[in-house]
Amino acid sequence: MAHKKAAGSTRNGRDSESKRLGVKRFGGESVLAGSIIVRQRGTRFHPGTNVGIGKDHTIFAKADGKVQFEQKGPLNRKYVTIVTE
């Protein structure tokens, strides 16, 4: 049995905590105002109607309704909108 650790092994063993990013409410789901729809780094998704964006680029609902994802515009950007009933 070795009494010395292998070279380099003592410098391993660290990793950052996962940030739980991604889509939290999918297309067609009902949401209430203030609900978080997407957590993201940067603007992978852009806010559409009845949707706001936080300082950390979190997309959230400004009104009650159903989530709708769409791609539009000359740059084919992804937009999140809330369709109110």
Curated annotation (Swiss-Prot):
The keyword Phosphoprotein does not apply. GO terms for cellular component: cytosolic large ribosomal subunit. InterPro entries: Ribosomal_bL27, Ribosomal_bL27_CS. Residues 1-22 are annotated as: Disordered. SUPFAM superfamilies: Ribosomal L27 protein-like. One of its GO terms (biological process) is translation. It comes from the Bacteria. GO terms for molecular function: structural constituent of ribosome. Keywords: Ribonucleoprotein, Ribosomal protein. Belongs to the bacterial ribosomal protein bL27 family. This is Large ribosomal subunit protein bL27.
